[in-house]
Amino acid sequence: MTSSSPNATKVKVAILLVNRQFIRSWIDSGLIKHLEANSNFEIHLFSDSEIHKRLPTSNDYKTVDLGEIQISKRTKHTVAMGLAQMSSRSRTFRFKLIRLFLPETLLFARHGNLRFKTVWFYKSFRRIIGNSLHNRMTLCYFFPPLRALINLYLKVLNEKPTLPKEISNGNFEWLIIPSASAIGYTTDFLEGANSIGLKTMIAIDNWDHLTGKSIYPIKPDYFTVMGKRCVEHAVQIHECDATRVLPFGLPRFDIYRKIEHNCNESFRVNKPRVLYCGFSLAHAEKQVVSSLANYFESRYGVGSIEVHYRPHPGPLPRYDGSTITNSNIEITSYKDLKRTAMPDMDEEFLNAILQADVVVGAPTTLILESLAIRKKCVLDLTNDGYHRTSAGNSALWHTHMIDLTDIKELPRGNTIDELHDQVDQMLQQPANCLHLDIENLYNTSEMLYRDQLLHFLLSAQHSKID
């Protein structure tokens, strides 16, 4: 590890954390400690009050409470208008706009008796009216004359976002902003940083951000993204300079680059195990999990194959009313998630994936994580007849999910029967692993994210890059 001399001036780096998940990605992962340990850097963590109270006490960095961060009106309108203007560049943007008005539920349920379908229609129609009233301003963004009036209003308003004085007066060389969703503070902070010549980096913390979470009216000096495919999305959707988009991976995914894969190694504890990974969007997955368990019990006998269900830690509401009544299904119960909103990526988390013979789920992050460590996976692409966002339909509308379904060798089930057959076939295969080419999405053979970031910052320090 390169170290500076005792008398060398340290590079001051400001890191802005305004999402609980970044505590896991940047602090719990050891990333910030790794940067600070280099001795070339002095790390300062800035956050709003809500996040600041959750930050652990450490000598590895200094923390600053910025209070409540206000977002400018210009940014609120500009980002929202951008989604409408750029909807032709990403299916996810279009689906996101559709879902602002149409509910998560289908207007007509495809299952149930007449009374159930009638009540379903009534509630879905009410949601359409409620959504339309709540998001009525978005309609203005679709019409150029109205956009022109809004832009004129914003010009007259003449807002000039500035950085908090704790950052602008801190003599920092870098402002790094981890980002996972469309939050307007990013644009305000980028504009404020540009006004004082502060170099900026947006560290994207997921794989769907550039395809559907936000737009960038003002771009940072650099992005870090999960993989090469994300670089392509940055160029094609956001018109970024490819040389400014760095495919370092994700801080929380470094754990998968540390695992040495062995095709002959089995992590099976007892019986063959199927793990179903829950979906964040509304999907009647409990019906799918129950059907898998019932299928294996009827085919091989009760208790012959374990079925484990790991719900998403932050799922959107489901409206189908399904419950799991089969007591043989093992359901993950999460500990207190108030601190980071996500489960710790500890040994228990890893073992949940490693000890499964087959991992099943919608095209979500956890499926990608399972593929990264060569687990046998099957995609759930079923449609439940209740939700607009059920797995099969979501896979057609989300650009990042299409990147996963484009891997033709990845087994999938478009119907419940197909899903049963595909999972059964994968269980019967003697191989413990599945080797698919996902390097364009996430490359496990690259250096750890924290090492790539460290090397980049050191190179920037020595070469004084812009």
Tell me the role of every PLM-derived stretch.
Residues I167-S168, G314-L368, I373:
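Donor nucleotide-activated moiety binding/catalytic core segment of transferases
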Residues P217-P220, T365-L441:
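Catalytic binding pocket for nucleotide-activated donors in carbohydrate/polymer assembly enzymes
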Residues I27-D28, F253-R339, G413-T415:
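Conserved catalytic-core segment of nucleotide-activated headgroup transferases in glycan assembly
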Residues N443-D466:
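C-terminal alpha-helical cap of glycosyltransferases
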Residues E42-I43, I218-F223, E306, Q355-V358, ...:
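Short active-site oxyanion
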Residues A14-R257, G314-L316, L366-I367:
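Active-site and donor-binding regions of nucleotide-sugar-utilizing enzymes
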Residues V64-G67, T332-K335, T340-A341, D406-E418:
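Short acidic-hydrophobic, aromatic-tinged amphipathic segments that line or gate anion-handling sites
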Residues T9-V13:
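Extreme N-terminal starter segment of soluble prokaryotic enzymes
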